[in-house]
Amino acid sequence: MSVEHAAVQRADFDQVMVPNYAPAGFIPVRGAGSRVWDQAGRELVDFSGGIAVNVLGHCHPALVGALTEQANNLWHVSNVFTNEPTLRLAKKLVDSTFAERVFFCNSGAEANEAAFKLARRVAHDLYGPEKYEIIAAVNSFHGRTLFTVSVGGQPKYSDGFGPKITGISHVPYNDLEALKAAVTDKTCAVVLEPIQGEGGVLPGELDYLQGARKLCDEHNALLVFDEVQSGMGRSGHLFAYMHYGVTPDILSSAKSIGGGFPLAAMLTTEKLAKHFAVGVHGTTYGGNPLACAVGEAVIDVINTPEVLAGVQRKHQQFKTRLESIGQQYGVFTEVRGLGLLIGCVLSDAWKGKAKDIFNAAEAQDLMILQAGPDVIRFAPSLVIEDADIEEGLNRFERAIAKLTS
């Protein structure tokens, strides 16, 4: 039985919502695959993926089926009890990664909060209270809680909230010498994104990530990889650390892991996990049956040779066409990234104008993303159809052509 809802419009946002977002001027109401329809029935191609979340597009049948089945059985019991979907998903993550233990939560910020707390707890338990310093990268992004925004290397997000959490420093990304100079015996963790997402879709260099691993080993520090944006097939591997062959001690995952349903996880080893004894950390909703049922369906679809190989092929399809557009119109100078996390770096003449390109794309019925003011970001579904890629890139080129005419 359908329910009749009161009509709402984009203007209502400004009347009832806290103004910390500035959403587009249209409201999406329906999605299927890599297409989205707004209230007026306009059809858009989605290259944004809900900011790298809708890893299987909109309303994928496997996810709809898993959610519907679980919704008819059990929604929530809290972590006073466990549940079957949680245990099934945890086992699949353990079987597919370096990890031996999993902590579920609801968002990337929560997963990183757990990761950073665990790193400090391990150091405290093993080496004493003086070993608590965390080193992260300039322009990194790890969430919006007070702890995670302090670890993030972007003052525009962390300033203005009173004293920041102490013991956190930042060094330039991909600068191994700077990292060597920063790490000491007081360092409890080095926190890195294998691919900086919000910082401009900047992949880590192999020798940099290998060097970080070596430094952590030499100083009894933990290597924490934030794979909130790069994980769950986005790079063409289940997790980006597999692309580099550099294994972290702790890994955070969110966004794609739930395919659009709020879900996140912290992965680690048994040896480290034991420092989170009962009551040391927790969450009410984390690992709820609905989220984990969807997460299990996500990993079942993604973690196959066909899908992961398809990501690599689709990357090349995007890269070839985007480089051609860049050469023809002179709007961007570099196409970078891994898999289906792709960034176009704007040329000097267009620096600071990513929002203009975002708006021009929307006018051509295309949903894209920014990664700061100087980079256009694409994070589409990993199973996006070739025809949708072609059509979306045609619309993108029309937007660029109109801007530059």
Curated annotation (Swiss-Prot):
Pathway linked to the protein: Amino-acid biosynthesis; L-arginine biosynthesis; N(2)-acetyl-L-ornithine from L-glutamate: step 4/4
One annotated GO biological process: L-arginine biosynthetic process
Annotated binding of pyridoxal 5'-phosphate, by residue: G108, A109, F141, D226, E227, V228, Q229, T284
Cellular component aspect of the GO annotation: cytoplasm
Additional detail: May also have succinyldiaminopimelate aminotransferase activity, thus carrying out the corresponding step in lysine biosynthesis.
Catalytic activity: N(2)-acetyl-L-ornithine + 2-oxoglutarate = N-acetyl-L-glutamate 5-semialdehyde + L-glutamate
Name listed for the protein in its UniProt record: Acetylornithine aminotransferase 1
Keywords: Amino-acid biosynthesis, Aminotransferase, Arginine biosynthesis, Cytoplasm, Pyridoxal phosphate, Transferase
InterPro entries listed in its UniProt record: Ac/SucOrn_transaminase_bac (IPR017652), AcOrn/SuccOrn_fam (IPR004636), Aminotrans_3 (IPR005814), Aminotrans_3_PPA_site (IPR049704), Class-III_PLP-dep_AT (IPR050103), PyrdxlP-dep_Trfase (IPR015424), PyrdxlP-dep_Trfase_major (IPR015421), PyrdxlP-dep_Trfase_small (IPR015422)
Cofactor note: Binds 1 pyridoxal phosphate per subunit.
EC number: 2.6.1.11
Pfam families listed in its UniProt record: Aminotran_3
Main location: cytoplasm
Annotated family: Belongs to the class-III pyridoxal-phosphate-dependent aminotransferase family. ArgD subfamily.
Assembly with partners or alone: Homodimer.
